[in-house]
Amino acid sequence: MRIALAQIRSGTDPAANLQLVGKYAGEAATAGAQLVVFPEATMCRLGVPLRQVAEPVDGPWANGVRRIATEAGITVIAGMFTPTGDGRVTNTLIAAGPGTPNQPDAHYHKIHLYDAFGFTESRTVAPGREPVVVVVDGVRVGLTVCYDIRFPALYTELARRGAQLIAVCASWGSGPGKLEQWTLLARARALDSMSYVAAAGQADPGDARTGVGASSAAPTGVGGSLVASPLGEVVVSAGTQPQLLVADIDVDNVAAARDRIAVLRNQTDFVQIDKAQSRG
């Protein structure tokens, strides 16, 4: 399977960002990719009020993604925001394939919220609850968003649900060691799940993080998108600037790794005990 990662730099205008989706999806299709993965917050970058741009998954922006997928003949995974009843939004991925109706046509709401490094995502974002796996040209693809990557159990659960490739769409926070952590986490989650991991991040915004209502603590991207193999090897990686990565993956390697290393098969439940009980 040939996949592409679109490391873009989202702005605050959803219509302009949708044009970026069209541009990169077309380039990915021309390169022969069957799937193109965009970052978290493709619809609108983080660090600005999101409620005013949020739309339902059957709204105009998501339907624009579906149209692009059909016109380009490629499955698109992209980050957007949807409204909730409590005034917050969900941090959502839409996965839309070509066709009428689109196949696949699914969405995932980010489960683990980024209440860390001085940022409180849960103040404006409501969490999702359910892991999601979609099928793209016969390959089972798990969906995750940014901070999810720090939680190995989600990745092993997706693998147990049959995921052979797991997409993580991010707008990673900058800071000392953060790019290195991103790379290490993507490789580690590939090893945990014995899956390919397609880690698509926002490009480094440079000096673009200004504007009314902007938050300096918001994670707005560092680049460094990559594909990791089931053995944790980096198949392909990007720098910090906007770029389209293309990689060929062989899902037979997933089955081979799971058979040879057997992490998922040999994982054993254990009883938690307190410190007093653990003293011999």
Swiss-Prot record:
Assigned keywords, A-Z: Hydrolase
SUPFAM superfamilies: Carbon-nitrogen hydrolase
Enzyme Commission number, as recorded: 3.5.-.-
UniProt superkingdom: Bacteria
CN hydrolase domain residues: 1-251
Molecular function terms from GO: hydrolase activity
InterPro entries, alphabetized: C-N_Hydrolase (IPR003010), C-N_Hydrolase_sf (IPR036526), UPF0012_CS (IPR001110)
GO cellular component, one term: peptidoglycan-based cell wall
Family statement drawn from the similarity comment of this UniProt entry: Belongs to the carbon-nitrogen hydrolase superfamily. NIT1/NIT2 family.
Alphabetized PANTHER family for the sequence: DEAMINATED GLUTATHIONE AMIDASE (PTHR23088:SF27), NITRILASE-RELATED (PTHR23088)
Gene3D superfamilies in UniProt: Carbon-nitrogen hydrolase
Native source species: Mycobacterium tuberculosis (strain ATCC 25618 / H37Rv)
Active-site positions on this chain: E40, K110, C146
Protein name per its UniProtKB record: Hydrolase Rv0480c
PROSITE patterns: CN_HYDROLASE, UPF0012
